[in-house]
Amino acid sequence: MRNPRSIALLAAALLAVAACSNVGAPASVALTPIRLQLQWFPQAQFAGYFAALEKGYYREEGFDVTIIPGAVEIVPATVVAGGQAEFGISWVPRMLAPRESGADGVVIAQVFQRSPTLQVSFKDKNITKPEDLKGKKVGAWGFGNEAELYAGLRKAGLDPDNPDDVKITAQQFDMEAFAAGEIDAAQAMIYNEYAQVLEKKNPATNALYKPEDLNVISWEEYGTSMLQDAIFASEAWLAKPGNEDVAVKFLKASFRGWIFCRDNAAECVDIVLKSDAKLPKGHQTWQLNEVNGIIWPAPNGIGITDAAAFDRTVQVALDGKILTKPVVGTPWRNDLAEKALAALGDADTKGASWQKATVTLTEGGK
């Protein structure tokens, strides 16, 4: 018969071993579902969010994040206002416009620091400045994406509503009409449509087009640019108990995703390709390189909104008739992004030393 004291000691020892085996094991905690509404289809434009999901950064903050693709007809501000998503990604003017109808979106992190919007033309058109667009067929996407162009035209003394000044032509979200000569100057993002031209063959040479075959007007350089991709949420949602803390943690994880994509571009492109992105690897590699150049360096830290840039954006949106009246209140805040940056500790949140890579494009962006 065993000694009762021995049995007690054995039981205690087994409990101790069991306790030691659980040291450092994560507690079983239910994840909070979070939905993020994109403004466009999955591509490297949104790489940081896909990276945060793939690398487990959102999960580390206690979130089960669903990333919802966008499309032409989807307005993220309306989706968020209707409670179908907690967070959205949007150009700032497209978030502001629904506020005139009662939406309450507020920017909580300004991720893109600079505008990537261009007007692109072939060299033989001799369009080197906005004034040269007079009498030309000028492509515009519409859907609120034309405001920088319209503001630039007006600054150059041209009326986009007057066909005697400039012939505004509806442009698809590609460069096919431009390549066919149906548009003299096409709207393009440096991270997307501009590269689409460089991925096409010049029929005169049977070689790919080169940057020197093109003239480019940058609305950022001309002074009529708008703040674009920002993370926003509903003011009413943020006012509910605990949701500001949720927002800070979401921003922290998202910023980590963008930092990862800055420092690990090749792996980040592979993550994007797994997200059902339609454009091929070569094009996504170019896109991420250019998107990183729009985000970094971030002089005050990723996500911090510059007040002067926001005010300029509002004015451009008013000039472009995206907004019909001055903005009421201050629909942006930096306090949540600042807390997220502080929570990242010693991480490089400014990217001051980051430099663009050289990306060689191939036909079709493959």
Q: In which residue ranges do the predicted regions lie?
A:
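Short, low-complexity disordered leader/linker segments with a strong preference
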Residues: M1-T32, D346-K366
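Short linear loop/turn motifs
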Residues: T66, E73-V75, V166-I168, L214-I217, ...
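Alpha-helical scaffold segments in soluble metabolic enzymes
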Residues: G48-A51, A97, E148-G152, Q196, ...
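Secondary-structure end/capping motifs
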Residues: P241-T324
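Pocket-lining segment of extracytoplasmic ligand-binding domains
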Residues: P93, K125, F173-E176, I183-K278
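Conserved C-terminal helix/tail region of periplasmic/extracytoplasmic solute-binding proteins
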Residues: D311-K366
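Short, glycine-/small- and polar/acidic-enriched structural segments
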Residues: A27-A180, D184-Y191, P211-D213, I217-W219
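Short amphipathic alpha-helical segments at helix boundaries and their inter-helical linkers
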Residues: Q84-A85, I89, G293-I304, K339-D346
